[in-house]
Amino acid sequence: MSINNTNTSIAKGIIITNLTGYITIADVDKWFYSFERTCHSFIKQGKKYKLFVNRKGYTPEHFSVQKLWKDRFFSTEILSHTIAVAFLLDAGDILDHLSQTNTKENIKFSHDYEQLMDWICQFK
């Protein structure tokens, strides 16, 4: 089992959230509490934000873990305040599919941390 990272922080005005390693339902709950609190710090000030979502090295304990993450992350309130979202994922079929089918200019998927961080920092 790999060590998990459920940390959320702010750097360069970007909310960076991590959900990596071997993840359980309890880990998603812990992650969401920190993630939501960080997003609300911007929302309360009437500010929009950029999100950098690190899911590289993510291994859910059970399919219900992925469903819970999806239900929590894709909250209308949280996403309606975003300027752009960058998803760092493992290379492979899922990343390829998401990259090829994405039609939104303010969303990007990649396995390359530096490329993705450059993109979100420069996104206007």
Give the predicted meaning of each segment:
Residues M1-K124:
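Amphipathic, Lys/Arg-enriched alpha-helical "gate/interface" segment within cytosolic domains
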